Design a protein with these regions (language model features):
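Alpha-helical transmembrane segments
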Residues: 2-103, 134-172, 213, 228-243, ...
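Juxtamembrane interfacial secondary-structure elements that flank transmembrane helices
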Residues: 98-112, 203-210
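Juxtamembrane helix-capping/reentrant segments at transmembrane boundaries
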Residues: 114-129
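Flexible hinge motifs at transmembrane-helix junctions and intramembrane kinks/re-entrant loops
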Residues: 180-183
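Carboxylate/His-rich catalytic cores and anion/metal-binding grooves
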Residues: 189-200
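Fold-level signal for large, globular catalytic cores of enzyme and receptor domains
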Residues: 209-222
Length: 450
């Protein structure tokens, strides 16, 4: 899997000598460019960029929530409380990342930016695995919100705790992967284990509505998939957790795609809440909002350090955490198939990666573009990733420009689904209550025209 690190072997820094060939010798000195102090501060967050990005992505969501739809006060109040906690989590994450960077450097968890090799920036130790800060703040926010919002006898409490258990489990496994650097085949097993609490707690329906053009051929209007639907959700959790990890390789891409998808999920949820009169249907989408707002806020804080040029790397800890969180909200919010549409860029990247991931072609450790230090441009290689495919199709680009292009593509794919949802939601306003019993139906099937 493509990852932006080339960590050096752990160096023993104790006062004891290293024994080699029965002779005691001192550890060789590091080259001058590697003698970086662990106390050296990282670059400050890119606050201006994050502020502009936040306005672009979050303003439509709050406009729909507060002005466009007439949403009940009892439903808006917990969403705004959650938003306030998320805002506090943003500033807390911004403050904690520089502190955590010093500790991970002391433990030799760092990497070199391969896409800057041959330049002074390519010799700087970049702290790795800073996704652990995002995950820790996220867990604190969601637990505090649980105390403020859910009663002890709430029907949603079991699923909420199961969601937090799966997310926490996946964060732990991701950090283990960062430390041990496990083979990619093992990576497929990690989310399958972490998803078990989620699947065991799922109490939603497993039926889908058959599109009318297919009803004469199938003979059914509603099909109950039963246990097969849970298998689908299990594979969805595995895919979402790994797809962000393999759609990577340039500064800001991992955190950036999470921010774009999370924003699309929020807009989708508020449109479904506003277009429905069914309280249970509204609560399912509000449940999703409660988890996505903290994810978006903490990811924006991480992106302020991870945007080009990155002063920290997110690590597998973050990609696993973010992927599992979005899988959880899609499954328990009952729009798991719609979620897959938001991941269309990741689906394309996975399809391009299949020959290498499954051993049909040679798969190098880092499937990154080729960097030219003279021009500062990236050239696409023959590796099967969307990053390289985009460069081969549209020519060489700088790393910053390439990331912006890829996130724009991600946003366009997600917004197309959002606008489709908006038009259908307006058409079907007031009919959601009769559609709700098929809670697990795909978004593109439930909105089939009558």
């Amino acid at each position: 899997m493509a990852r932006k690190r080339a960590s050096e072997p752990t160096t023993i820094t104790t006062k004891e000598a290293i024994v080699t060939s029965d002779k005691e010798t001192k550890p060789p000195p590091l080259p001058p460019h590697r003698q970086t102090s662990n106390d050296q501060p990282i670059a400050p967050p890119k606050k201006g960029f994050i502020f502009k990005l936040s306005l672009l992505l979050i303003a439509p969501y709050f406009y729909l929530l507060l002005f466009h739809y007439q949403i009940q006060h009892d439903l808006i109040k917990p969403i705004l409380i959650n938003a306030g906690l998320s805002l506090a989590g943003f500033f807390l994450t911004v403050k904690l990342i520089p502190v955590a960077s010093k500790y991970v450097l002391k433990r030799n968890l760092f990497g070199y930016d391969i896409n800057k090799k041959g330049t002074p920036q390519g010799t700087v130790k970049v702290p790795e695995s800073l996704g652990i800060v995002v995950a820790a703040v996220f867990m604190v926010l969601t637990i505090v919100f649980q105390f403020l919002n859910f009663a002890p006898d709430s029907n949603w409490l079991v699923e909420y705790n199961a969601a937090l258990a799966s997310i926490c489990f996946m964060t732990l496994l991701g950090f283990i992967d960062d430390v041990l650097d496990v083979p990619w085949r093992v990576k497929l097993l990690l989310p399958s284990i972490a998803a078990l609490p989620l699947l065991m707690a799922y109490a939603g329906h497993t039926t889908i509505i058959i599109p009318k053009p297919l009803v004469p051929y199938i003979g059914l209007k509603v099909l109950d998939l039963g246990f097969i639907y849970k298998i689908y959700m299990w594979f969805l959790a595995i895919f979402c957790t790994n797809c962000i990890n393999i759609h990577a390789g340039i500064n800001g891409l991992e955190a950036g795609q999470t921010v774009v998808i999370a924003s699309a999920i929020l807009i989708h949820n508020v449109m479904q809440i506003g277009a429905s009169a069914d309280p249970e249907y509204q609560q399912a989408h509000a449940f999703s909002v409660y988890l996505v707002q903290p994810l978006l806020a903490t990811s924006l804080a991480l992106l302020s350090y991870n945007w080009y040029p990155s002063s920290v790397f997110v690590g597998d800890t973050y990609t696993y955490f973010a992927g599992m969180t979005m899988a959880v909200v899609g499954i328990l919010g009952h729009f798991s198939e719609t979620l897959l549409i938001f991941f269309l860029a990741q689906v394309l990247n996975f399809l391009l990666s299949v020959p290498q991931l499954f051993g049909f072609r040679h798969c190098p450790r880092h499937r990154l573009p080729r960097f030219d230090p003279q021009t500062g441009l990236l050239t696409g290689t023959n590796d099967g990733t969307l990053v390289n495919f985009y460069l081969r199709m549209f020519g060489r680009k700088t790393e910053n420009s390439l990331c912006m292009h890829l996130l724009l593509v991600q946003g366009l794919l997600a917004s197309s689904r959002v606008w489709t949802s908006l038009s259908h939601a307006s058409h079907n306003f007031g009919t959601r209550e009769r559609r709700w019993p098929q809670a697990g139906v795909p978004g593109f099937l439930i909105m089939a025209p009558d």
